């Protein structure tokens, strides 16, 4: 079972602090909209990059907006489950987990990149290390991100399984939490190989947070449905429509850059059945995660 954890919340006025319980008498039409973003990079960086989104939504929705970054994926699932946030930007698999525990959650948007609503996981290795191809991973440590991450755990682990490599049997599973932690650890030679979102990897290279000369690409996963934007099903219809419209009509590249996409399209729960199928390949019981 997922344990309740504290998570970080950040806003311009309050900074980082502990998140309290339900804050509004009217859950269906709260005075303030709390939006959670995944902790797939440093929280302070995410908060800083989210300020244009905050300003845009406050202008469109005519409500104060609080940007929240949880300490991990499980904390975000719990926050959505217990009504501590109204909108959540989940990873594909963390959304599937959240939906299994709170069926009223509604996906309403998905990022579009290069004309497609999907992305890939990239498997990388230390450039001068022992891993040159997938087969070389056998008998060695392999770094994943958060356990509930799609591109930094579920998808690459399923890819390795299809290649005959089973975690903790054929290689040692190492979880480092965040995508950037995986890239840095592999670049430094602390682990010989690992996996993360290809989109995040590109950003880390472009911003010179990792040196591509120290890394080797060994594989890409099959396309994965992109991160879904979700909201609480109990919100009043007028507010849900306004939230949906605000995101689907987003055109500002400075805001879309936060999501690493060029546009946001409509999404449905059925779009994520491929993740449920992937979990079956790995013999994961979603209800018990």
Please report, for each region that a protein language model flagged, where it lies by residue.
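Bilobed "Venus flytrap"/periplasmic-binding protein-like clamshell domains
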Residues: 35-59, 70, 93, 117-183, ...
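Short beta-strand->loop
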Residues: 105-115, 171-172, 205-223
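N-terminal secretory signal peptides and thylakoid transit peptides that target proteins
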Residues: 1-15
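A ligand-binding cleft/hinge motif common to bilobed small-molecule-binding domains
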Residues: 92-102, 161-162, 187, 192-212
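Acidic, polar ligand-binding/catalytic clefts
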Residues: 78-136
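An extracytoplasmic/periplasmic, membrane-proximal ligand-sensing/linker region
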Residues: 27-52, 224-226, 230-289
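Short helices/loops that flank or line small-molecule/ion binding pockets
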Residues: 74-88, 101-102, 135, 179-199
């Amino acid at each position: 079972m997922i344990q309740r954890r504290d998570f970080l919340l950040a806003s311009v006025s309050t900074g980082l602090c502990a998140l309290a319980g339900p804050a509004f008498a009217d859950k269906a039409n709260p005075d303030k909209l709390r939006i959670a973003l995944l902790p797939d990079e440093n929280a302070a960086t995410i908060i800083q990059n989210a300020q244009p989104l905050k300003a845009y939504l406050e202008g469109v929705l005519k409500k104060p907006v609080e940007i929240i970054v949880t300490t991990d994926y499980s904390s975000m699932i719990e926050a959505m489950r217990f009504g501590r946030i109204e909108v959540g930007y989940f990873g594909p698999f963390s959304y599937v987990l959240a939906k299994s525990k709170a069926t009223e959650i509604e996906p309403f948007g998905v990022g579009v990149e290069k004309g497609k609503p999907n992305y890939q996981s990239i498997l990388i290795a230390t450039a001068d290390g022992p891993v040159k191809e997938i087969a070389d991973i056998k008998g060695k440590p392999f770094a994943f991100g958060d356990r509930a991450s799609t591109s930094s755990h579920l998808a690459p682990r399923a890819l390795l399984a299809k290649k005959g490599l089973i975690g903790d049997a054929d290689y040692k599973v190492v979880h480092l939490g965040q995508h950037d932690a995986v890239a840095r650890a592999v670049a430094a030679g602390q682990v010989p190989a690992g996996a993360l979102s290809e989109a995040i990897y590109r950003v880390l290279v472009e911003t010179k947070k990792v040196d591509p000369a120290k890394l080797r690409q060994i594989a890409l996963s099959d396309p994965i449905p992109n991160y879904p934007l979700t909201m609480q099903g109990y919100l009043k219809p007028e507010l849900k429509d306004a939230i949906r419209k605000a995101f689907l009509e987003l055109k500002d590249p400075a805001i879309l850059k936060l999501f690493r996409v060029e546009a946001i399209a409509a999404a449905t729960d059925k779009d994520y059945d491929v993740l449920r199928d992937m979990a079956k390949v790995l013999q994961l019981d979603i209800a018990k995660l």
